[in-house]
């Protein structure tokens, strides 16, 4: 899972630096609207809304934008009716893609994704052919510099209900999705504040190198640039150094 975590961390760092901030806001607004629609507008009783609000604040989204998005979700303000859809696909080298989208037009989104996949050596897959390769989990990311003693932190995390702890930067605390908020709050009460999200972790990975690695990362980058795509989960395993080099090349 470390390969895809590295990819996520690179994207997170880029987001703080480049012109894609407006695109990130667009995606976060959709998540807030859907979370409020599904679970109500009070983040204290809606863990999903609470988590996305925290991410929006971390991205420096204005408070007014957050509040208006919540009201669009609850129906207090007029808003677009977004649907959550999972598209399953394959990238070059047999890498499985689990594409999470929010759209107001399923046909448009499917057509656009089919075009992007075809253009970059991928293809849409039949429903169910990829889903079994991924496991839904909660992830809490704790900045490594906030943890002085990893072993001590790991014990605290396990006592808090964590299933696994991955020593990376940021440190990844893995939980059952339904325990995400509980574990996050327990860690926070012990002085470890972190960003929480629900994600899909591959059960096994496909080692990819060279030209294939570049094609896979290019395809995922292009897919995530699509306004309707919230996140692309993949089961690739690409060496960290090679991934950094490819990303620098793609950005250039």
From Swiss-Prot:
Transcription regulation recorded as keyword: yes
GO CC entries: cytosol
Pfam (any one): TACO1_YebC_N
A molecular function (GO) term: DNA binding
Biological process, per Gene Ontology: regulation of DNA-templated transcription
InterPro entries xrefs: Integrase-like_N, TACO1_YebC-like_2nd/3rd_dom, TACO1_YebC_N, Transcrip_reg_TACO1-like, Transcrip_reg_TACO1-like_dom3, YebC-like
Keywords (A to Z) from UniProt: Cytoplasm, DNA-binding, Transcription, Transcription regulation
Localisation: Cytoplasm
Family stated for the protein in its record: Belongs to the TACO1 family.
The protein's name in its UniProt record: Probable transcriptional regulatory protein Tmel_0985
Naturally occurring in which organism (per UniProt): Thermosipho melanesiensis (strain DSM 12029 / CIP 104789 / BI429)
